[in-house]
Amino acid sequence: MRSGLRVLLGLTATVTLGAGIVVPAFTASASASSTYAAETWHWGPTASTDYKGWATGKIRSTSSGLRVSGDLYDAGGARTCSWVKIKWLTDHGRYRTATFKNCSQSTPRAFSVNTGYMLSAEAKVCRGTSTRITGRCSGWEGVWSQGG
């Protein structure tokens, strides 16, 4: 469907009336080269093994690669936090990680990381203190892979 729209963006249709008058039926003003259509993939929820922390999110294409974003929820007790760890494989064959925490116990925390061009991404949710992950982690869940 998107490739069909790209073809139509550069075309102008005309309708010929009975008296030989040609009237433009529609005119597409945007060209395919000036328009950038971002794609979005959703993932989650991924939960810690005690189900007191979970994360959901999306991966969105940008002009400089991909962006992984989402919300981290914390339903744990006092002095505990939920952590989400994102791991991705770059197009250069290197693994990178980003870690985010939420200690609010009531409000989801938004997170976002620009990954650039990547081959795959995984996420896991853990429990911990305000300074480090202590355990009760989910397994690595594949959230995005190039080619499906």
Regions found by a protein language model. Name each.
Residues 31-148:
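Post-signal peptide N-terminal regions of Sec-secreted extracellular proteins
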